[in-house]
Amino acid sequence: KITSNSPDHESLKKLRVELEKIPGLAVVSTVPTDIEITSINAQKGSSLLDYAKKDGLKPEEIIAIGDSENDYSMLSIPGIHSVAMENACDMIRNICVYQTRANTRDGIAYIINCILADRENFKL
């Protein structure tokens, strides 16, 4: 992964447009002042699916939690239980099935506790 940071948002937008033209690259931002460049085969989604396959897990048996663009490939896997943090960007909130508290309010612990408290209704 290559990360570039700059306070110049316009330059980063132009760089992103050019990088997105290169086949095989995934280009995302986690905040307006950065850009992340990876191979499309090194994204969280493909890594999670590889791990699941090795362990014999189906997407329906997986919970994934995220808040920014670099989580998109993981949270958009069909069938997965996708959870957006309260502080997630709109792109992530719009694709997730569930939402939890913000990362500053123990959002991951909160969603895990909710699942454990209601196991009968939350089938994995």
What residues fall within each predicted segment?
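Conserved acidic, metal-coordinating active-site core of Asp-based
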Residues: 1-65, 69-77
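Asp-based, Mg2+/Mn2+-dependent phosphohydrolase catalytic module
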Residues: 82-124
